[in-house]
Regions:
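Transmembrane alpha-helical segments of multi-pass small-molecule transport proteins
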Residues: 42, 112-117, 138-160, 174-185, ...
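Hydrophobic, membrane-embedded alpha-helices of multi-pass small-molecule transporters
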Residues: 33-51, 184-190, 200-263, 281-303, ...
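Membrane-interface "cap" regions at the ends of multi-pass membrane proteins
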Residues: 1-60, 64-65, 164, 181, ...
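Extracellular loop-to-transmembrane helix junctions
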Residues: 57-86, 101, 108-110, 250-253, ...
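Membrane-interface loop-to-helix entry segments
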Residues: 132, 145-150, 154-187, 201-203, ...
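C-terminal membrane-solvent junction of multi-pass transporters and transport-like membrane proteins
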Residues: 325, 339-407, 412
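Membrane-water interface regions at transmembrane-helix termini and the short interhelical loops
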Residues: 57-61, 86-87, 126, 130-138, ...
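Hydrophobic transmembrane alpha-helices that form the core helical bundles
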Residues: 109-140, 299-315, 329-330, 338
Length: 417
């Protein structure tokens, strides 16, 4: 690999690089955004219908106080890991799966990119289903056709790259902030604060606090690994990055799940499909206005899902049941967090042990990368295994094991070399 120093401060002069949204090159400093616009983008990415699913999954079998604790612990872990991965993206200027190239090699990148692509497209399709269900109440068109039309609309900003997403997010941020506040206040008012805090379920879908925390982490597991896609456009300032990410996650992934629990109690159902259909009405008192706000929430999140999926695909080819929800979120919380842990270990932890990489961020072509970096891939695989078979909070166990093993395996490999 080349020892050439990278320069993310350079102004890119190739005409097609900006058109390609810097998929394979660092984002130059003069094309980056300040913390306010980054907050708008991050907030809008966080305000997602899936957050209601997180709330209903927790509330369906945990006392509200326990659900609140699980949500708090999970979000603290999420934001801590995300701050590190987004800082890596901001510092290098590279997209998530481009960074992964250096860490795990060519074959490892194929595996990681495929997982992210499938996950992101899955969430994209799920939210299109919600879009179709909501608007079918007001427009005499079938849900599948509405979903297709919604997909075309939401893809229209994603195909324009980060610039298109930033413009939509700037427009949508204030309405979505109001939506979160109204949803929380009105839903809690309808059920009552005392009733909310005294709520105790009859079921046992989630059960333990550890599984509840894993569910919270799993609901945003893909985000931990893909936030460099967004963070690479931020100016490198760890303090502002931290503030922006904490604030965005608080509004979208803390307050909205609480509103989801309160709404589910008021509607007397834990079907998050029903909750998502009516949360807009409960928040605004108007079906149409509520549907428009839900559409904005789905659109601003789905553009990022499609954006990350397309980035992941380029790295490969170079160019309603609540039990189901819990299983999916739990699986994501086991498999994907170690991917983020590999990135953190490689870029932030290994240098502490004297292992310094000479990565040339201006050249991420596969011909300059090893076919596979076994220490990194094995650390990830072992981290997933630890998460599956260990007791406690699986996502944390998997990430910690991955970081430790990544360091150990790389130190051993370096000694042999």
């Amino acid at each position: 690999m080349s020892d050439k120093k990278h320069d993310v401060n350079a102004v890119t002069t190739e005409p097609n690089v900006e058109d390609q949204d810097y998929i394979y090159t660092p984002v130059p400093q003069n094309k980056r955004y300040g913390w306010i616009k980054m907050f708008f983008v991050w907030l809008c990415w966080n305000v997602v219908v899936g957050d209601l699913a997180t709330g209903t999954a927790l509330g369906s079998s945990m006392k509200f106080r326990d659900a609140l604790i699980a949500l708090s612990i999970g979000d603290i872990i999420l934001v801590a890991v995300m701050i590190m991965t987004v800082y890596i993206g901001s510092k290098t200027g590279l997209a998530a799966m481009s960074l992964i190239r250096f860490t795990v090699g060519r074959v490892g990148t194929y595996i990681f990119s495929a997982i992210i692509c499938v996950t992101s497209v899955g969430w994209f399709a799920t939210q299109l289903g919600f879009f179709g269900q909501i608007w079918s109440q007001y427009i005499p068109i079938s849900v599948p056709i509405l979903a297709v039309l919604g997909g075309i609309m939401m893809a229209s900003t994603a195909i324009k790259g980060f610039k298109g997403m930033e413009k939509l997010s700037t427009f949508a941020a204030i309405p979505l902030l109001l939506f979160i506040v109204l949803a929380l206040v009105n839903c809690v008012r309808l059920i009552g604060v005392d009733s909310l805090f005294s709520y105790s379920p009859a079921g046992s879908q989630i059960g333990t606090m550890a599984t509840g925390v894993t569910t919270v982490i799993g609901s945003w597991a893909a985000g931990m690994a893909t936030v460099p896609d967004c963070g690479r456009f931020a100016k490198t300032d760890i303090i502002k990055i931290s503030i922006v990410w904490i604030a965005g996650l608080f509004f979208g992934h803390f307050l909205l799940p609480i509103a989801g629990i309160a709404a589910a109690l008021h509607l007397e159902t834990w079907d998050f499909g029903v909750v998502s259909d009516y949360i807009g009405v409960l928040a605004t008192g108007s079906g149409i206005i509520g549907a428009l706000l839900i559409t904005l929430a789905a659109w601003t999140t789905n553009q990022q899902n499609l954006y990350s999926a397309s980035n992941a695909t380029c790295n490969i080819i170079e160019v309603k049941k609540k039990s189901t929800v819990t299983i999916v979120l739990g699986a994501l919380g086991i498999v994907i967090p170690p991917m983020a842990a590999v990135m953190v270990a490689d870029y932030l932890v290994l240098p502490l042990f004297g292992v310094k990489h000479n990565y040339n961020y201006n050249d991420i072509s596969y011909e300059n990368l090893p076919l596979i970096k076994w220490p990194s891939v094995l650390a990830w695989g072992c981290g997933v295994a630890v998460a599956i078979f260990s007791p406690g909070i699986q996502a944390i166990n998997g990430m910690v094991a991955t970081v430790v093993l990544h360091v150990v395996f790389n130190l051993v490999a370096n000694k042999k070399n």
